[in-house]
């Protein structure tokens, strides 16, 4: 069982297209399109498991997509951006209760990309730590042709998410 911490509404701001070299283009065609973000929860006390592997991440998304299709709240077309997955990856030593620094991966638009991106990022973080380095709290993007994640920007504070509760909507708890 994977818990859901919150579901909130956002607006799409657009899409960055990374082209040759260090150039990027901005596509505003989706600007203003409403988004529903689902944030998962790991809470052993409440019986909610964590996602431990790329296989589990892909399976969770497959099941979540089925539920969203059944409820009629999404058409689930990942290739068109109707359903996206932006996993946060954090590893920890076996037996430790503390997770390490978290990275977020953007641009995962298929179940295969979710599997490959999560698998790569777990291996990358393991390699960084094994070589004596430090994992940086950052947003990374999935580069499908190269099958690697690439740094987009660092995240110093949780406030950088610019998440503001809507004062006219009361929080609701579902069981």
Region roles according to the model:
Residues 1-175:
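Basic, nucleic-acid-interacting segments
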